Regions:
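Short S/T/G/P-rich N-terminal loop/turn motif that feeds into the first structured element of a domain
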Residues: 26-230, 234-261
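Bacterial Sec-dependent N-terminal signal peptides
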Residues: 1-28
């Protein structure tokens, strides 16, 4: 049992270090990916850890959980206002972690719950992304109440690799779409992010909507407006001929409302 307690303590300390912070929105997103053969076993223990952490710090953790459609892959997402705050979190964890572990130690059957989670869960690691505000449209979302934000349950995630045209060509094309959308009255929620450390993609675009059905309908409406514009068509044909990026992967993610902290 002592060995199990030490393993559990180390895991909890590491997890709390990753996911405790007290900022409502930031320039950096930490995205932790894991697969679960048994969501109930995984999330029961994780829910205990995060709920206890929230109780200890006395504030919302501003963390949300998503599940990839038709998959056992999950993503835990939280934000930092700056890289310095990411570093400062390590210092805060020295005080928070022992309190969290002490409270969890008193939970009935905690060893069994932890071992069940450990057996069911395969962690894939964390990625840190920087938001590029000038290539994003998140202000309307940030102005919403927490209840309004919960209505936006769907995320379309597109991972891009750059072509030989280079980064400036990719960003110039993104800027063209943004400017064109403003002229055409096209408005939707999206965030363009760049990995802080090297990953399997150069950029990540996240599009927000209330459901996958709403996303596809709104996407179709947007494209109809865009293709009605001569300048947009000319740029589209140019990029089709000489691409500035290629799609590495696309995800359809749904918010798990019961696991918001």
């Amino acid at each position: 049992i002592c060995v199990n307690q030490n393993i559990m303590k180390k895991f909890i300390y590491t997890t709390v270090l990753f996911f405790t912070a007290f900022y409502s929105f930031g320039q950096y997103f930490l995205i932790y990916e894991f697969e679960s053969e048994n969501q109930s076993d995984t999330m029961e223990m994780f829910d205990l850890m995060m709920s206890t952490t929230k109780e200890v710090v006395g504030k919302d953790l501003n963390m949300v959980t998503f599940q990839k459609e038709l998959s056992n892959t999950h993503f835990l997402v939280r934000t930092y206002a700056s890289l310095q705050e990411w570093v400062d979190e390590d210092k805060a964890s020295e005080e928070i972690n022992p309190q969290v572990f002490q409270k969890l130690s008193g939970v009935e059957n905690i060893q069994e719950k932890f071992l069940a989670m450990q057996k069911a869960t395969d962690g894939k690691g964390a990625r840190l992304f920087e938001l590029l505000p000038e290539y994003s449209n998140m202000s309307p979302y940030l102005a919403m109440s927490n209840e309004e934000k919960k209505e936006y349950k769907y995320r379309r995630v597109v991972l891009y690799d750059l072509t030989d045209a280079g980064e400036q060509a990719f960003l110039a094309n993104q800027k063209f779409w943004i400017d064109s959308d403003k002229e055409l009255g096209v408005d939707y929620l999206y965030a363009l992010m760049k990995p802080v450390f090297a990953t399997d993609a150069d950029y990540m675009l996240v599009l927000l909507d209330k459901s996958r059905f709403d996303y596809h309908k709104n996407w179709s409406d947007r494209m109809d407006k865009r293709f009605s514009d001569e300048d947009f068509n000319a740029n589209y044909e140019k990029i089709e001929k000489d691409p500035v990026s290629s799609v590495v992967e696309e995800w359809n993610l749904n918010l798990l409302e019961e696991f918001i902290y």
